[in-house]
Structure formats: C-alpha cells, structure tokens
C-alpha cells in the first residue's frame, strides 16, 4: 500500500457494479432502474432547453433554484395539506450517494459518532462510512420477514461504551429485500432520541406508495432521501434529494461541494417533475409485472422468494453456492441480476425482459439445482 494512504483504506471494499462484458446483448436487471427510457418527445424538449438555457462556459445554478421549486411542488402533493414544504426543507445531491456522504460528514466525522445499519441493506451506507473512517454498527434482520432486530437496535443506541451512535439509516422499502417498514419499526424510529439522526431512504417510494413525509415536522432528527434514478427514469443524470428540518438542510448545504449538480441534470430533473404524470404512468404496469413474476417464482420449489413493495424481487436458493451459480448462469444466458446478501435481487423489467428472465431461470434451475420435496 502506498505510504501516504490511510491504513484503514486497505480494509475498504468498493461498490462493485455488475461488469457485464459477455459480448452479448444483456437484460440489465441488476441496478433497479426503470426499464423504460425517457419518451422521445421529452428527450427532444430536454435537448431544446439545453440549447436555449445552458451556457457551457458558465457554472450550473449552485442553489438549484428551479429544481428545488419543482421538488417542493411535488412534495406538496404528498403532504395533503398537513404541512407546507418549502425550498428551505430541500437539499439536492449528485445522486443520493453524495447526500449519504454529506450526512456522514455532518454527524459522525472525526470520532463524533458511529452509524447504525440493519443488514442486509443498501451497501453504500457502510462503504461510504468506512472510507471516512467512521465506525459502522451492524445489526441483523429476521431471515423470514426481514424486519430489523429492534432489540439489537435499541441496545446499539443506548450503549455507553465506545463511539456513540449518532446516525441511523433505514430504507423504506428496504433494498435488497423489498419489504416496507412495519408499524413496530416506525414506532421505534419515532422514539429514537433527538441526538441521533434518522435517515429514511425512500428511493422506491413511487412504487410502494408509502412515505413518512407527513410526519417530518414532528421529527427534526429525521431526514428523508429520495432519487430521480428509479421511477423518474433519470439514472444517467445522478440526481438525489433530501427533505428535512431547515437547520439540518442548512448544514448539509454548507457541506456539499459547490456547483455539485450539472446544468443538464438540473434541467432533466425539473422536466421529469413537470412530466411526472406521464413518467409515473408506467408504475402500475411494472407492479403488475412484479406480481406476475412473484407468483411464477413462488411455486418453484428450489427458490424462496419474498413479497415486494418495490420494483424488484429478492430470492434465495438452499445455499450461498447455489445462489452464486444461479447468478453466473443467468449472466451467461444474458440476464444480469444483483448477487447480494446470499440472494438474488432481480429488477422488474419490460414484459419481454421478464419473460426471458423466467426462461433463463428455468434453464439454470433445471441444469444445476435439485428439486426439493
């Protein structure tokens, strides 16, 4: 290791996207993107606005003024008049990953705190924390329901030895297991003490239809994060946003890098929100496809598959080695899935992609997995 690098970086593991590289056309079902691109008319509108509104020799709007106004309009639909969000409640990041990094810096850096996660969950929480030298406290989940071990969570936040927990990440619904928060889990979050920040990642909110946004004013130690990369079809543009107490948002705005979001990404996200009815109209079709795949896979004796409140399914075989072999065989046939947490996370694709997934799974199972009684 180079002598000027921090020694603990030797233990850090990067996020590994599926490398592909098979030389064949692939169904990309490993990153939970929407299977549908922006419609051609919206792409043309975006191109026109790029020509009209962007001077390439000028930096982007560092305050994200128009985008924040569009986000506030979107949020106002979801609060049902219970409270009125404003731009002071919103921060914007270069993907949710930048928000995660800023949150960790604001709460835990320099030995100020540790971060609590219930695994399996989104791996970037732990990855980013470790790159910053922040301790990660990992608790488990029930292997059948994927609910958090709340007793372990309570022990973690009340322990008095070592670095105190200052930050807790939860995903609603969770990735890779696709389960939404239960009422017991929500009740636990409601009583987390005010010196601990609770980040509720609602990346898949548009699919689950469940949000804790209405409760946000009662919990200044809550922050909700969301993304444009899933339901709003802008993964290529890397836009995430957070909603929280204005004092928390002001701190995150102070930490983030200047001009963090390119002008074209801001235009694309603003346009996506203007056209949200058109873009979100695909969600019922995706949910129908998700439920169809779930029913098909549920009767395969070699698989255990869980219900989903998101745009993906999570399944397991009898052993970790069988699951790894299944992922490799799917890739060899042209279907990329995410092998994680000793299971497979499969994004819901187009009907044609889903049919190929079912066929490829059947072939792989027939070849390598014994039937169970």
Curated annotation (Swiss-Prot):
It holds the Pfam family Aminotran_1_2. Keywords: Amino-acid biosynthesis, Aminotransferase, Histidine biosynthesis, Pyridoxal phosphate, Transferase. It catalyses: L-histidinol phosphate + 2-oxoglutarate = 3-(imidazol-4-yl)-2-oxopropyl phosphate + L-glutamate. Its EC number is 2.6.1.9. The keyword Amino-acid biosynthesis applies. GO terms for molecular function: histidinol-phosphate transaminase activity; pyridoxal phosphate binding. The keyword Amino-acid biosynthesis applies. NCBIfam families: PRK02610.1 (NF002726). Belongs to the class-II pyridoxal-phosphate-dependent aminotransferase family. Histidinol-phosphate aminotransferase subfamily. PANTHER family: HISTIDINOL-PHOSPHATE AMINOTRANSFERASE, HISTIDINOL-PHOSPHATE AMINOTRANSFERASE 2. Homodimer. This is Histidinol-phosphate aminotransferase. The gene is hisC.
